[in-house]
């Protein structure tokens, strides 16, 4: 549910240091920039908890599964689907897979498959040996989840993002700018949501660490904007297997108070 925006920085850094290149959503942290693998399969576990402006807490468990295919040197295609369990009073998930406010109900538990997400990422040529890395990503989220269970708004959402990083020695600062275009579900007043993230990635021992500050405008005027800090560590644990651990802390009522998870990625050349 977090931070595909930071993957491009980690990718550029790893490529510059070791000739090995490694994104919401979080599974793409390992996948996005891997230039040595043609197909990447990922799965893991994510837990988040927060009040989202409501008196009662909402807990969300996500078990994601994703595939990413490097079609050419400059084009990557991806798809992801997740099993979701949500417990709390705000039981309608918005375009960012977080509860929408304004739905006061008794505390409920709902679960099932979420929306199907598909993406395409274009790596902009910056010249051989250039320290710059620029990725442009478009994503569509299709309403395949159960609307009656509150796991989707029932409408198609779109997003675009630009990720820019610059390699300096063993680290790479990065910035990401994005925009999510929400569908228009009946009875729910949603608005489009810009986002921004700034941070850095660095080689640490046999792995890589990334930290960032993330902001996203709330999809609803009833909610606060999301402000959070994020950190992740990723390393190779076998020839074709990477392990990533991550966590974030919310700085506003519009973000989860805490979020954390792990991700395993298998790579095929």
Q: Positions of the model-derived regions?
A:
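Cleavable N-terminal export/targeting peptides
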Residues: 1-33
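Transmembrane beta-barrel domains of Gram-negative outer membranes and organellar outer membranes
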Residues: 21-169, 173-184, 193-232, 240-246, ...
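Active-site cleft segment of glycoside hydrolase catalytic domains centered on the general acid/base Glu
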Residues: 188
């Amino acid at each position: 549910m977090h931070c595909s925006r930071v993957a491009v920085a980690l990718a550029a850094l790893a490529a510059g240091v070791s000739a090995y290149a490694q994104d919401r959503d979080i599974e793409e942290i390992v996948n996005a920039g891997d230039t040595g693998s043609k197909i990447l399969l990922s799965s893991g576990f994510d837990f988040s908890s927060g009040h989202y402006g409501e008196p009662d807490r909402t807990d969300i468990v996500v078990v994601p599964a994703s595939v990413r295919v490097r079609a050419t040197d400059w084009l990557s295609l991806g798809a992801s689907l997740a099993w979701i369990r949500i417990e709390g009073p705000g039981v309608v998930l918005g375009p960012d897979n977080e509860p929408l406010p304004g739905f006061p109900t008794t505390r409920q538990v709902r679960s099932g498959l979420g929306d199907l997400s598909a993406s395409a990422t274009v790596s902009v040529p910056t010249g051989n040996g250039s320290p710059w890395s620029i990725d442009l990503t478009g994503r569509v989220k299709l309403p395949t989840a159960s609307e009656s269970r509150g796991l989707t708004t029932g409408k198609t959402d779109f997003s675009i993002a630009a990720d820019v990083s610059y390699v300096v020695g063993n680290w790479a600062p990065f910035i990401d700018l994005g925009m999510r275009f929400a569908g228009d579900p009946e009875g729910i007043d949603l608005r489009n949501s810009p986002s921004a993230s700034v941070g850095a990635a660095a080689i640490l021992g046999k792995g890589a660490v990334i930290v960032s500050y993330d902001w996203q405008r709330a999809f609803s005027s009833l909610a606060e904007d999301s402000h959070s800090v994020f950190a992740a560590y990723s390393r190779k644990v076998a020839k074709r297997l990477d392990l990533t651990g991550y966590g974030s802390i919310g700085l506003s009522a519009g973000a989860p108070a805490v979020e954390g998870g792990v991700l395993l990625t298998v790579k095929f050349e």
